[in-house]
Amino acid sequence: LHVVLCIDRAGIVGNDGATHHGLFDMAYLRPIPNMSICAPRVAEDLRDMMTLAQGLDGPVAIRYPRGRSVLAERHTPVEYGKGICLQEGKDLAVLSIGAIGNTVQTALQSLPNGAEVGHYDMRWLKPMDDSLLHEIGKRYKTLITVEDGEVCGGLGSAVLEWMADHAYTPRVIRLGVQDRFVEHGSTAELNHMLALDAEGIAKTISENCHS
């Protein structure tokens, strides 16, 4: 059945209340056969994904957060099942999906100039970009996955599974919501509490840059 699910209020939604957070959708949609799942980082991605989804077979889920979108300085058109490299690194790479990738970019800008950290916007949780993941698996010793949802079954789990299936052995650190319900609060307060703001992400990167 070809249906396009536009999942609004994905991730932490802030003042809408504790029952409105969209934290579990990636984890429960990923096991469904023939399901495609994507998340835009910037406004242009969302436009491309909605256009692309109309021509796909099977169900497609496009997840995006509450609030205003970010416009891209330079936009790479979205391709089905393909991620992009936003920044190349040396020993450590951050893999993100969706709008939280903009927070990762802010975090990276706060690091010392000598930090050589890669950043990849995966764009698609399912299917995953095999060629990009092979490149990442060969190149990096440490990976940090960042997602605005439950880490159990989400991007972090998917990356761990893929690396194990293809005999790569990087250390994988998963940032996201750790097996819990999240209370009411502003997005800034909650992301800070979960270490998913720029400060928290930068701290995790710094602690693992030379491990």
Model-derived regions, located:
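A glycine-rich helix N-cap at a beta->alpha junction
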Residues: 1-9, 28
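Thiamine diphosphate
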Residues: 6-7, 12-22, 55-211
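Internal gly/pro-rich beta-alpha loop/helix module
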Residues: 15-33, 39, 43-54
